[in-house]
Amino acid sequence: MKENTLIVRQLGRQRYLPIWQKMQDFTDTRDDDSADEIWLVEHESVFTQGQAGKDEHLLAPGDIEVIKVDRGGQVTYHGPGQQMMYVLFNLRRLKIGVRELVTWLEECIIESLAEYDIQAYAKADAPGVYVNDSKIASLGLRVRRGCSFHGLALNVNMDLSPFLRINPCGYAGMNMVQTKELKGPQNLETAGAGLVKHMIKKLNATQVKHTEGFENE
């Protein structure tokens, strides 16, 4: 059993579509002996439209690709300078439900930002994490065969202007903020390390393997 083993993959900057496909493939082929994994990645510019997504929230996507995906939620933007943390966990083995995993993700963000004296918080009616009514992180998950994929997006040091082309997560006029502006993590390496540190505690992982990329590539 791989209950307390965690693999953390640093994937660098990647196009969205191949990583989404790899998440699905991993989830479809894993078994009860597969270790849980965290994937840290930075995406090329893309809008992703969740399963509940409505086209009216895509105001003016322009030259940025729009991809309809299988996570929950509405439309959001991913791009350079934003830290993605994908959580490929066997929820049945962890004995948690999707709601508890959402709470874990929110707490990882809140706890890592608290180390910089940033007071972040979650909202019951609007998933994600906020600072002074501005959104700093988005969440979206899918569970298949009792296992999760997708995860969180933390705004770190990025061009926030593409968010003006959409209603982020379906909320018109939602203001976005990033850690750089708040004297938090200034780069993805620092931001990602903080998120992973807090998730390791929640998983009670005793064997953590850090690696870059995928095997056989």
Curated annotation (Swiss-Prot):
Gene3D superfamilies given in the database record: Bira Bifunctional Protein, Domain 2
Ranges of residues in domain BPL/LPL catalytic: 32-207
Further remarks about this protein from its record: In the reaction, the free carboxyl group of octanoic acid is attached via an amide linkage to the epsilon-amino group of a specific lysine residue of lipoyl domains of lipoate-dependent enzymes.
Cited PANTHER family: LIPOYLTRANSFERASE 2, MITOCHONDRIAL-RELATED (PTHR10993:SF7), OCTANOYLTRANSFERASE (PTHR10993)
Listed CDD domains: LipB (cd16444)
Site (Lowers pKa of active site Cys): K135
Protein name per UniProt: Octanoyltransferase
Gene Ontology biological process terms, A to Z: protein modification process
Subcellular location: Cytoplasm
Pfam family, one: LplA-B_cat
Active site per database record: C169
Family: Belongs to the LipB family.
Catalytic activity: octanoyl-[ACP] + L-lysyl-[protein] = N(6)-octanoyl-L-lysyl-[protein] + holo-[ACP] + H(+)
Protein's organism: Pseudoalteromonas translucida (strain TAC 125)
Gene Ontology CC: cytoplasm
Annotated keywords: Acyltransferase, Cytoplasm, Transferase
Residue positions binding substrate: R71, G72, G73, Q74, V75, T76, Y77, H78, S138, L139, G140, G151, L152, A153
InterPro entries noted in UniProt: aa-tRNA-synth_II/BPL/LPL, BPL_LPL_catalytic, Octanoyltransferase, Octanoyltransferase_CS
Gene Ontology MF term list: lipoyl(octanoyl) transferase activity
Enzyme Commission designation: 2.3.1.181
Cross-referenced PROSITE patterns: BPL_LPL_CATALYTIC, LIPB
Function: Catalyzes the transfer of endogenously produced octanoic acid from octanoyl-acyl-carrier-protein onto the lipoyl domains of lipoate-dependent enzymes. Lipoyl-ACP can also act as a substrate although octanoyl-ACP is likely to be the physiological substrate.
Involved pathway(s): Protein modification; protein lipoylation via endogenous pathway; protein N(6)-(lipoyl)lysine from octanoyl-[acyl-carrier-protein]: step 1/2
SUPFAM superfamilies: Class II aaRS and biotin synthetases (SSF55681)
